[in-house]
């Protein structure tokens, strides 16, 4: 059963987070939830400048819907606030004129980092890293019993040649924390040289 069928059958709202749409590595055409015919009034699309333009912390985005009732309800919340931060607005507006060539360079760089990181991770005994189809992070299975404890240990009690690694325990990314107990989330936002150093430190840990 397709998502559209579920939305129609159970009369659901489909909240579609599409902030990573520029970073899809499958070579397939990007399909927005708004392209699904028959559920136009049920779709609420969420977008942001923070991922596309590497502006983490800039809380500027959009909530888009064709449903007037949803729109009116959202506007009540919007009008209860003065505005998004001024500096964020200025930065976001300037970002909209970013050349397409730059976006293509960023895409190619993330793709190269992804391929490098996945290859390095899967060479470490006991580690499994699936190849993500988009975004710039990966959920990694580690040969440990509890990644919450392991991540804390790496920060407080471990170093290799004066360096350590900081990772996000996987338990925080699941409705059932047990599903991520042996996983960590890694972002490939560093250059390949630094990623290589981090993988050496992780292997030693």
List the model feature ranges, each with a label.
Residues 1-205:
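PLP-dependent class I/II
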